Amino acid sequence: MKKFLSMIAAVSLLAASLSACGASSTTSTTAAAESGKEYKVAIVQQLDHASLDEIRVAIEAELEAKAAEKGIAIAYKDFNGQNDTTVLNQIGAQVVSDGYDAIIPIATLAATTMATATEDNQIPVIYAAISDPGEAQLTGIANVTGTSDALNTAFILDMMLKANPDIETVGLLYSNSEANSVTPVREAKEYLDSKGIAYLEK
């Protein structure tokens, strides 16, 4: 089981790095394992979105490739939370009830919901596409780990100034309901303050 979980974590890391960035579901099973044991993995995507779709497809491809390489069987099932907390909570309850061996949530709301759903049973949660795991309170949890796709805010703003060095005011557009917005917005404000550039928040 430890080797399986290490493999799942590696798959999540690799898939996230390879990606460019209801509960409709499908199931796929890899080649049968020599031991006859089949591991069940739930892939929980927060919503339909091109970059998240890419990550999910990459995770599925890596699961199949690694399972074939290691000679184990993995049955994975896709769940879509439709960006709805109620739907995600229902998925979390179902995944726990169905006895999945691991959960791979994609994006912040999916990850925090799955972390909460597994508090009692400690099913491993390996998240992907989280910009700020600390701000999302996904760190320091024994059964939760994953990958971060944090922005390099200073680099982005440096490029902006190279393209337009005379810029006087910058608009900061973000969602206050999204935990991933907190750190990059704070970093952007600090950067702009240091350059004496005004900003507007929306």
Label each PLM-derived region with a short phrase.
Residues A9, L13-L18:
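Hydrophobic core
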Residues L18-A31:
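Bacterial lipoprotein signal-peptidase II cleavage site
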Residues S35-A61, K66, K77-T86, S177-S181:
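Extracytoplasmic "Venus flytrap"
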Residues V41, I59, D149-K195:
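An alpha-beta-alpha
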Residues A42-V44, V95-T108, I126, V170-L173, ...:
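Periplasmic-binding protein-like
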Residues E60, A65-L88, N143, K189-K202:
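Short beta-strand elements in bilobed, periplasmic/extracellular small-molecule ligand-binding domains
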Residues N83-A102, T113-T116:
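Short, well-structured alpha-helical segments in soluble
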Residues T113, A117-T153:
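Flexible loop/hinge segments that line or gate small-molecule binding clefts
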